[in-house]
Amino acid sequence: MSEAQETDVVVVGAGISGLAAAEALAGAGSDVVVLEARSRTGGRLLSTPEGLDLGASWGWDGEARVLTLARRLGVATYAQHLAGDTVVEDLGGVLRHPGNLIDVPAHRYAGGAAGLTDALARRLPAGSLLLEHPVDRVVVGAGGRLEVGARGRRWRARHVVLALPPSVAVDTVDLPDLPGAVARLAATVPVWMGQVAKVVAVYDEPFWRHAGLAGAAASRLGPLQEVHDLSGPGGDPAAIFGFAPAALLGPDAEAQVRAQLGRLFGPRGAEPRSLTIADWSRERWTSPADAAARPADRSRYGHPLLSAPALDGRLHWASTETATSYAGHVEGALAAAGRAVDAITG
């Protein structure tokens, strides 16, 4: 193993929380290294080349951090399409419900939410972001500094920011000095959307709008249980997306989804020009392999043991699951990142 490289802060994970923390810390004068296991940035922010989100997509009224960030980065927002009726599916068949049952105003990001993380990554100092560097060990070293290992390399840092879900952190990183109570808690914190598949169907036009439908649906039959319009500004590109419990998707998932979209929206619904299934439960760096067998207790989000630094104030949790407000949202990820930055710079 190589000699340890000295740095101020190592950030583990290049999702929205990790990149936001790294940009802020670098801007405050800290020497920062960002280590990302995947071959891309973004984490659970992932968009197709057409700008359609396979991960986080929405922002909501009152979420000031993400709106401020989008404006600062020059990422435009637009309103989620809500106009039209909802389709409801249960054992009795498919019914059309007047109005949109899911009518909470929300906004999306032109070009996809991954535009936020792409822009943040571009703002980091050259050479500070290392992809395909899964961290395998964080230990307390000489002088109380934390030693971080990844791909046979080592870094020695004053602080480490764990910007990945707590259960993934304790599942993939050797943390021998972490107090047992913290490690046990982290292992039980469910990953937001970690057992969900997001399905995106793209069409030549938003034909459902012409029929007075919102592109929204609720189903008790599945596999998609909740469906929304995912179209870009002005309906271009035209798309619908739905959430499905990953456990309900079998080897014939694509055929299942096409059949359901046909039931919900008619023959044209069953014939998208493309269909993408993003099963987040199969992402090693998003969800532990045995996560489906763990209790999904979201009351543990923002737990005091995970919203406070560990290891004498040197190890900081910064994923959305550790946020004390807006946990699960991009806003929560930014709040957690900001908390870590304040603890390090304050």
Kindly label every feature range from the protein language model.
Residues 26-49:
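Glycine-rich FAD pyrophosphate-binding loop
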Residues 181-210:
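Central beta-strand plus flanking loop segment that forms part of the substrate or channel wall
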Residues 162-182:
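Flavin (primarily FAD) binding-site architecture
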Residues 57-64, 101-119, 253:
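Short beta-strand to alpha-helix junction loop
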Residues 67-87, 206-215, 270:
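A short alpha-helix-loop-beta-strand transition element characteristic
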Residues 10-12, 35, 154-169:
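Short hydrophobic core segments
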